[in-house]
């Protein structure tokens, strides 16, 4: 027996002398290489640009053209980076366990088993809650920033959605530098609608002695749209013309939303924001107003309906045309002088038609493929 032990000892020493590496040394080298690879990957991401606004770190999101969009994109980017870091850690620990804590083929011994380690288990339980709390905090901070409203925006826009297009009206323009002011409320049309509604509401049910409510949210059946706004300068889309909403850069803009029929959704991908457009917003308890601090650059940005609303929902597009404040005031002057939207755009040197999308074909009988010829 002693001879056998001496033989094993001699063989082990001989293997070390000819360069066999201990298992612990191999594990250390693998750990160092893995750490180096992770470090290089993180370094590459950080030095790829001083800003996280690049195609790799946006992870599929648009860059955004408003301060609100930038904050949401940054939240998205850092959330993904945190998720990736946690994924690398979890998968790394998993593969480490699989590779280095398995039973060796030629060894009768099982790997060391680690269980019922209360401090370790409490740590693993607490870490996910900490991560969730941190993400929740930053989500609430960004959400509150996006939903903030000021009392006196520079431009107030009425947005009316209907199957399957849009109407935009300029309700009020008040540049704080005193450069331009405009009250676009069409009081005649709005007062007529409210007068009709008031007349109906004052009708008395002679049988019960109280006002007679209408069939639609208490309103008359032929006057369910009295909640809509009307403006003297409006742009209405048609099946042959995409509505172009002209807005100034560098100004606080408020959007007041309402639908004339079913539920729609106002969505400009470059705003990284969408909001449901409800009929009867007040009765439906919906917040139909949102603001953007500014549009940071000029350009044409496609807008879409993001709520399934019927046959041509997928083609219910519009365009936001961001121009300088000087061009915007000239555009409004052209519209107030009686020019159409296309004519006013051409007058300020802009394309008179949408450049980010195109009109749709409303012919329900059109076919995408030619019918086979008769033999």
UniProtKB/Swiss-Prot annotation:
It catalyses: 4 Fe(II)-[cytochrome c] + O2 + 8 H(+)(in) = 4 Fe(III)-[cytochrome c] + 2 H2O + 4 H(+)(out). Pfam families: COX2. GO terms for cellular component: plasma membrane. InterPro entries: CcO_II, CcO_II-like_C, Copper_CuA, Cupredoxin, Cyt_c_oxidase_su2_TM_sf. Its main location: membrane. It is a multi-pass membrane protein. Binds a copper A center. Gene3D superfamilies: 1.10.287.90, Cupredoxins - blue copper proteins. Keywords: Cell membrane, Copper, Electron transport, Membrane, Metal-binding, Respiratory chain, Translocase, Transmembrane, Transmembrane helix, Transport. Its cofactor is Cu cation; heme. PANTHER family: CYTOCHROME C OXIDASE SUBUNIT 2 (PTHR22888:SF9), CYTOCHROME C OXIDASE, SUBUNIT II (PTHR22888). Subunits I and II form the functional core of the enzyme complex. Electrons originating in cytochrome c are transferred via heme a and Cu(A) to the binuclear center formed by heme a3 and Cu(B). This is Probable cytochrome c oxidase subunit 2. The gene is ctaC.
């Amino acid at each position: 027996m002693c001879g056998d032990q001496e033989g094993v000892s001699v063989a082990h020493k001989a293997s070390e002398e000819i360069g066999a590496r201990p298992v612990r040394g191999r594990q250390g080298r693998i750990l160092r290489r893995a750490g180096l690879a992770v470090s290089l990957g993180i370094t590459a991401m950080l030095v790829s640009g001083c800003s996280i606004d690049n195609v790799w770190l946006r992870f599929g999101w648009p860059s955004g053209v408003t301060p609100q969009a930038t904050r949401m994109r940054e939240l998205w980017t850092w959330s993904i980076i945190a998720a990736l870091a946690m994924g690398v850690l979890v998968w790394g620990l998993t593969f480490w366990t699989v590779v280095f804590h398995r039973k060796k083929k030629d060894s009768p011994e099982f790997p060391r088993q680690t269980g019922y380690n209360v401090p370790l288990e409490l740590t693993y339980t607490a870490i996910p809650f900490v991560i969730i709390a941190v993400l929740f905090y930053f989500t609430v901070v960004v959400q509150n920033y996006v939903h903030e409203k000021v009392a006196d925006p520079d431009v107030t826009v009425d947005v009316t959605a209907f199957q399957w297009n849009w109407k935009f009206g300029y309700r009020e323009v008040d540049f704080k530098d005193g450069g331009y002011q405009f009250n676009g409320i069409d009081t005649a049309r709005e007062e007529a609608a409210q007068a009709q509604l008031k007349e109906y509401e004052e009708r008395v049910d002679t049988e019960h002695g109280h006002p007679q409510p209408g069939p639609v949210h208490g309103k008359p059946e032929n006057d369910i749209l009295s909640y809509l706004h009307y403006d003297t300068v409006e742009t209405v889309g048609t099946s042959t013309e995409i509505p172009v909403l002209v807005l100034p850069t560098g100004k606080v803009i408020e959007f007041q939303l309402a639908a004339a029929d079913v539920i729609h959704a106002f969505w400009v991908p470059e705003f990284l924001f969408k909001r449901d457009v409800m009929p009867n917003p007040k009765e439906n308890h919906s917040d139909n107003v949102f603001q953007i601090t500014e549009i940071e650059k000029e350009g044409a940005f496609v807008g879409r309906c993001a709520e399934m609303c019927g046959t041509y929902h997928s083609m219910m597009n519009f365009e936001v045309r961001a121009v300088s404040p000087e061009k915007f005031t000239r555009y409004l002057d052209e519209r107030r002088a009686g020019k159409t939207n296309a004519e006013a755009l051409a007058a300020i040197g802009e394309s008179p038609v949408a450049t980010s999308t195109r009109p749709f074909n409303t012919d329900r009988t059109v076919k995408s493929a030619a019918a086979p010829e008769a033999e």
